[in-house]
Amino acid sequence: MKYTSSFLALLLCVLLGFSGSYGQGPFFKEIENLKEYFNASNPDVAKGGPLFSEILKNWKEESDKKIIQSQIVSFYFKLFENLKDNQVIQRSMDIIKQDMFQKFLNGSSEKLEDFKRLIQIPVDDLQIQRKAINELIKVMNDLSPKSNLRKRKRSQNLFRGRRASM
């Protein structure tokens, strides 16, 4: 577990580096603290390749990237929750979580609470499974690209209106 946590702390650096602000935020020093604590600079951490950076390379579109980033951020929140009793690194984790919260959820505490609720839902609970299946049609409908269709129709109507007035 220690090697996994070390590698994950290192990957947090990589993930936050993709946002274009690596080395600029208050989190940089705290990530360095975590890397030191977990001995994440040790060469054996690289065994088996990276966890997230190769996956992120496959997601080019901004909206698609947000999907995979949400899973990665969820992973880090779970990791930090698992390590919450470790007083040596608690401050560093709190600062990183706050910065991640600002970047990923735009500082919205409501979104953070929703995000936390989602990652806490147990998938092995029968009642939860039943509720999830019951809501599946609504979720699938929400996933469909209706909003793009509406935008396209609006754009077409706007274009037609301009052409008619010329």
Swiss-Prot record:
The modification Pyrrolidone carboxylic acid is found at Q24. Released primarily from activated T lymphocytes. Glycans are attached at N39, N106. It comes from the Eukaryota. One of its GO terms (biological process) is extrinsic apoptotic signaling pathway. One of its GO terms (molecular function) is type II interferon receptor binding. It is found in: Secreted. Coiled coil: none annotated. Keywords: Antiviral defense, Cytokine, Glycoprotein, Growth regulation, Pyrrolidone carboxylic acid, Secreted, Signal. Its main location: secreted. One of its GO terms (cellular component) is extracellular space. Pfam families: IFN-gamma (PF00714). Residues 1-23 form the signal peptide. Belongs to the type II (or gamma) interferon family. Homodimer. Interacts with IFNGR1 (via extracellular domain); this interaction promotes IFNGR1 dimerization. Type II interferon produced by immune cells such as T-cells and NK cells that plays crucial roles in antimicrobial, antiviral, and antitumor responses by activating effector immune cells and enhancing antigen presentation. Primarily signals through the JAK-STAT pathway after interaction with its receptor IFNGR1 to affect gene regulation. Upon IFNG binding, IFNGR1 intracellular domain opens out to allow association of downstream signaling components JAK2, JAK1 and STAT1, leading to STAT1 activation, nuclear translocation and transcription of IFNG-regulated genes. This is Interferon gamma. It comes from Ovis aries. The gene is IFNG.
